[in-house]
Amino acid sequence: MNLILLGPPGAGKGTQAKLLIKRFQIPQISTGDILRAAVSEMTPMGVKAKGYMESGALVPDEVVVGIVRERLEKNDCLNGFILDGFPRTVAQADALKHMLVCMNMSIEHVVSMAVDKEELLQRITGRRTCRLCGKGYHVVFDPPRVSGRCDECLGELFQRDDDQEETMRKRLDVYEDQTAPLITYYENESLLRSIAGVGSIDDIQQRILSIIQGTHG
């Protein structure tokens, strides 16, 4: 099963991917993780990426695609994979398609998790993290027993810069500009299935499974 999960920041892609990994015993491939690993291992593409990163430049698509290919060639991807954070643009999607053809592989499912912008803002801006132990909370959905203090160590809770409303709105704007066109791209490829990314974690997981198992209407 070769799957792409699409959705804006805060849609819950990471949470759903973890459940799918456990169920299907396939790897979740995060471009951030594999980029760092390729640089650390000094793979051919990792060496190229290192040069761009050290100069402060964006790593070009052809290098990112090459690093994805290096990862997909590993044995743990033989039974499938979940792509997380890639592709981000139509150009990357096109490059991925042609790369997979060369590898005699293809994407089987593209699941788009739709969540209202205000819901996303509430999810993200409500996050709080303990400065001492790193435990996460949410002011609405998972509040601490004592406001502003960690249940475990009584450390101060803080809001990460990435979780502040202004930053989050900018991230959502970038998603709309760059990544949302992927929805049209994969619709044209007859691969896209959209689900509501709201409700319980189990409810959302069942919607994804119904697509994978061919029972989604």
UniProtKB/Swiss-Prot annotation:
Its EC number is 2.7.4.3. SUPFAM superfamilies: P-loop containing nucleoside triphosphate hydrolases. The keyword Ribosomal protein does not apply. One of its GO terms (cellular component) is cytoplasm. Pathway: Purine metabolism; AMP biosynthesis via salvage pathway; AMP from ADP: step 1/1. It is an enzyme of class 2 (transferase). Residues 126-163 are annotated as: LID. ATP binds at G10, A11, G12, K13, G14, T15, R127, G199. Belongs to the adenylate kinase family. Monomer. NCBIfam families: adk, PRK00279.1-2, PRK00279.1-3, PRK14527.1. This is Adenylate kinase. The gene is adk.
